[in-house]
């Protein structure tokens, strides 16, 4: 019976560790640097002008997408906010502003 309980405890600990590695556990934040610690994802505002209601709250980015960006048109107005692995390249008559902290593309 003790062996069964020990085996169950080991399985639970392994599963909890795997959940944290996958980002399914509770997100840890370094309060001093105001940055997520652990799972490799960012927290950015993700929307465009048509879905600007979605810009009220930041969303978790896909894994390894830690760069937040804001794409501006030639008139200087933002058109798209999102996250990427690397800073995207601006097209003709566009400007991109990238940042690397959680929720930093809220402008």
Curated annotation (Swiss-Prot):
Q: Which domain of life is it from?
A: Eukaryota
Q: Signal peptide position in this chain?
A: 1-19
Residues excised as propeptide? 20-34
Q: Name one GO cellular component term.
A: extracellular region
Q: Which GO terms describe its molecular function?
A: toxin activity
Provide the tissue specificity: Expressed by the venom gland.
Disulphide-bonded residues: 44-68, 47-55, 61-83, 87-98, 99-104
Among its keywords, does the record have Glycoprotein? no
Write out the entry's keywords from A to Z. Disulfide bond, Neurotoxin, Secreted, Signal, Toxin
Pfam families in alphabetical order: Toxin_cobra-type (PF21947)
Which Gene3D superfamilies does the record associate with it? CD59
InterPro entries in the record, alphabetically?
Snake_3FTx (IPR003571), Snake_toxin-like_sf (IPR045860), Snake_toxin_con_site (IPR018354), Toxin_cobra-type (IPR054131)
Quote the subcellular location field of this record: Secreted
Query: CDD domains per the record?
Result: TFP_snake_toxin (cd00206)
Which purpose does this protein serve, as stated in its record?
Mammal-specific neurotoxin (tested on mice). Not toxic to lizards (tested on geckos).
Give the multimer and partner information: Monomer.
Regarding protein family, the annotation reads:
Belongs to the three-finger toxin family. Ancestral subfamily. Boigatoxin sub-subfamily.
Protein's UniProt name: Sulmotoxin 1
| Species of provenance | Spilotes sulphureus
